[in-house]
Amino acid sequence: MNVENQTPNVDHQEIAKFEAIASRWWDLEGEFKPLHRINPLRLGYISQRAEGLFGKKVLDVGCGGGILAESMAREGADVTGLDMGAEPLQVARLHALESGVAVNYVQETVEAHAQAHPGLYDVVTCMEMLEHVPDPQSVVQACAKLVKPGGHVFFSTINRNAKAWMMAVIGAEYVLKMVPRGTHDIKKFIRPAELMHWVDSTPLREKHITGLHYNPLTDHFKLGPNVDVNYMLHTRHDK
């Protein structure tokens, strides 16, 4: 595992994918439309499970162009956004400036950030990022190191099975064209049991898991108990 960040836990091809379309991050009808659509659900889940965000120090790992980071800052959180993509961070900084929202954006790996700032944050979020790095377990361990005792860490990713491949790759990329082709690689998807196993190797403990569902007939997203495709996991640092 890459906890000490001796070799940066970075997939440059993955970064290039998002840098190529970063200028359209805040286009509500563009490639990131699904992220804008699900953001209220993600924000609501995080805020509820963390017992509110106001006044809390929050880190958004893999923040991209800042959709979730900005929304948490609007809730009154002191937010730092972390990403390795220069172009998405430039977009995020500009949008925050235009929106009048204070977010501190940093270009750094989560492992390096954990080395420099252990136990700094009340809440850490890592949304749709684990499936885009070579060593996702290293990210989980770094997130655990960054949060205070009693603090909250949230992960979201995609399950690895035939249904997830049909929905997240074939359906979303080829049929519905919700995201660009090549966005996802089923080999990098993560089963909930795998993620929980990584969590159990840290001081984090699972508190709740929920699925994120899309109905193409109604064009509607909702949270629910089925974790066959997209899911979010709430964990808490054992005091």
UniProtKB/Swiss-Prot annotation:
Record InterPro entries: SAM-dependent_MTases_sf, UbiG_MeTrfase
SUPFAM superfamilies: S-adenosyl-L-methionine-dependent methyltransferases
This protein's UniProt keywords: Methyltransferase, S-adenosyl-L-methionine, Transferase, Ubiquinone biosynthesis
Catalytic activity: a 3-demethylubiquinol + S-adenosyl-L-methionine = a ubiquinol + S-adenosyl-L-homocysteine + H(+); a 3-(all-trans-polyprenyl)benzene-1,2-diol + S-adenosyl-L-methionine = a 2-methoxy-6-(all-trans-polyprenyl)phenol + S-adenosyl-L-homocysteine + H(+)
Tree of life domain: Bacteria
Pathways involved: Cofactor biosynthesis; ubiquinone biosynthesis
Enzyme Commission code: 2.1.1.222, 2.1.1.64
TM region(s), chain numbering: none
One function term, GO molecular function aspect: polyprenyldihydroxybenzoate methyltransferase activity
An example Gene Ontology biological process: methylation
Binding-site residues, S-adenosyl-L-methionine: 42, 62, 83, 127
Functional summary from the UniProt entry: O-methyltransferase that catalyzes the 2 O-methylation steps in the ubiquinone biosynthetic pathway.
Family, similarity comment: Belongs to the methyltransferase superfamily. UbiG/COQ3 family.
Protein name listed in UniProt: Ubiquinone biosynthesis O-methyltransferase
Gene source species: Pectobacterium carotovorum subsp. carotovorum (strain PC1)
